[in-house]
Amino acid sequence: MVTQVAEWFEANRQKMAYALCWALTPLFYVACFPPYEVNEAAFVFLVPFAVWLSFSPSFRSVFWTSFGIGWLAWTVLIFWLHHVTWAGMIALAGIVGAHFALWAVGTAWLFSRARGEGLWKGVAPSLGAAALWVIVEHLRTHIFTGFPWLPLSASQVDEPIVLQSASIFGSWIVSFALVLLNFGIAAYLIRLVGYARTRKRGVCPEFYLALSFIVAISFMLLRLSSGQQREHAFQAAVIQPNIPQNQKWDLAFERKILEQLEWLTLPRKSPNLDAVFWPETVLPYPINDDGPMQAWATRLATGVGAPIFAGAMGIEGEEGALEWYNSVFQVRPEYGLFPLYYSKQHLVPFGEYIPLRSFWPWMEKVVPINGDILPGKKPQLLPLNLENTSLRVGSLICFEDVFPSLARESVKEGASFLFVATNSAWYGKSGAAAQHKAHSVLRAIETRRPVLRVGNDGWTGWIDEYGSVRNSLDPWIQSTTVFKISRDRRWVGKETFYVKHGDWFVWTCWLLFGLCLWIAPIFVDKKTAT
């Protein structure tokens, strides 16, 4: 009986590997991200896929299998988008699934060049697979206006020690390391079975390389993150008004919204208060083109005794040729509206504008956008004047914190900290807010700047330069508090290697992938290669 079972397993190994690939890879991939946050799942989510790949399936099979797995996993991850659009959710999941398929086929090609039984045959393909994952993630940041939501590195936001090297390499390094570890573990499991009765059973260069790499990037900056020299920066009152999305643009609720902002803001008056922060587009009118709205906001800033950083629509131009912007303004006590303001640079396609509107006018009937919002042109910093110094606020609006380059540009301009004004009310009580917050953790570490996030509901809190959440409000309720923001004085006025040099590691991965393609056949045992 035992012999028959063993023979059945031997005869059906590839089918079992294929079944486990479908069952476990999407399950572990989804589980490693917020809101589930089983971050350890990121260490093994590709193991079933890598084991199945060892059976040399056809490229066609690899493409359709990985596309289906990617589509399934991403449908679950962005299911919250159905609150806005079912069709958009399904289509977007398919697009990201296609990126996963692109990576899978490229990886299969790498391994096809290293067939045989050489001890080192899997090293180059494993490195190449990790490099290709970074390349595809980077492409996802730019193709079709970009959707870099949940890079693999975002799975580790609850383990900041793993992320610290992002200040040098960008968060790409963590994605690289996790994919390399997955293939190292898979190689070790395959070797345990394939070399069960030989001395080579415990010898697995891929696994040792991956483990060494993980340890290196985790501990290379441990001393820096543990030797912090924190100093008080400023006190910020944060307002989370929890305005239902169906009320935000309904003029019948205008007075109610303004009254909410008043009674949430005014009680925060204190001699030690330095600033008040409101979420994205919280005001019902464009503040820079509305005299009564400006007067109201100025009275409120004067009443609380601190400048208010307010998310609101901005408007420029003359009647009949108005230009609309999604902006962050500063309203000062007594003085009123500060003339400079930040406008969102990376807009949401089909949410804030219709791409190539003139080519498909029928799209206006599908997407109810009367006019396009225009993008801002630069990372306009706003001053925060304190008693003995002045800070510079780098603003990011909505999902702009998912784009590493926007945070980098603000810090290169001299931002002392990053302010993310957002609104997750579109997506209901879902995992969207927790997923969104994960990107702010990555931006904080990459730039070594504190990140203050203020949402209409969702997640409001602040994150230090090392990715640790220092304080936060409960989500999906109306709330307000005062955060005492501190900073590590060692990074004041300084730029990280990543801020200075950008995505240099991505270009290194392009070189590494090409190199691995070239050397993959070299370590194959020519006597056993097929």
Task: Locate the predicted segments by residue.
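Membrane-embedded alpha-helical bundles of multi-pass enzymes
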Residues: V2-L224, K429, R443, G455-Y466, ...
